[in-house]
């Protein structure tokens, strides 16, 4: 069973996925990206950080399930990551997630969101300047227009509630 978790940057997708790992057994799909590694990120766990040339080589060799440009960097999911038994969770950028869900109805899409004030606070805490935050908020509002295309919508106002809602979704679908 493949779950795609998406939402605007800063809504807590990584935090939710990390907390899910304390409650359920799943394989997390590690994506490739060309963006610089943040201080708190771990190579091979959060992302595989690669060059533009390496990313293009993966595309040329048809190793990517999906890929998108976001914020001036590329993000992509290797095909090898979905060939797993059990529960697989993908953390994808909204455009890539939307395209992938349209091309494969077997995947389950979960859109994560938070209110604007909290999103701005999180972006500020990451050290972004006002111009960057303004651009991200415009992008977030554009991405939210796609939230109705997902199987589930989770408002992440409280981490435990959001995690429990996702666990409930996974358990319900596993029983079917």
Question: Where is each model-derived feature located?
Answer:
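Walker A/P-loop
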Residues: 14
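Hydrophobic anchor at the beta1->P-loop junction of P-loop NTPases
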Residues: 5
